[in-house]
Amino acid sequence: MVVIRLARGGSKKRPFYNIVAAPARIRRDGRFLERVGFYNPVAAGGEEPLRVAFDRIDHWVSHGAQLSPTVARLVKDAKAKVAPAA
């Protein structure tokens, strides 16, 4: 099974997460199939805190991928921000 989840990067006390589609049995920061976005919880100034490729998320979900609870929340919030602008 494929899971869309966060893979941690960054340095100590400065987390940065890649949103990746990865097999469920692979470790958190291990091999992945595709990077579909990123999340920067400590974004400062003009830095972009979240970027999600909705078309790729939809592609993986249509092929049976599951969203982790945190990624599901982030995607829901990102879609809510995009919808009023359209």
Curated annotation (Swiss-Prot):
| A GO MF label | structural constituent of ribosome
Keywords for the protein's UniProt record, in alphabetical order: Ribonucleoprotein, Ribosomal protein
Q: GO biological process: what's one of them?
A: translation
Cited Pfam families? Ribosomal_S16
Gene Ontology, cellular component aspect? cytoplasm; small ribosomal subunit
Q: Which PANTHER family match?
A: 30S RIBOSOMAL PROTEIN S16 (PTHR12919), SMALL RIBOSOMAL SUBUNIT PROTEIN BS16M (PTHR12919:SF20)
The similarity comment for this entry is: Belongs to the bacterial ribosomal protein bS16 family.
List the NCBIfam families hit by this protein, alphabetically: S16
Please report the name of this protein according to its UniProt entry: Small ribosomal subunit protein bS16
Source organism of the structure: Methylibium petroleiphilum (strain ATCC BAA-1232 / LMG 22953 / PM1)
Give the gene that encodes this protein. Answer: rpsP
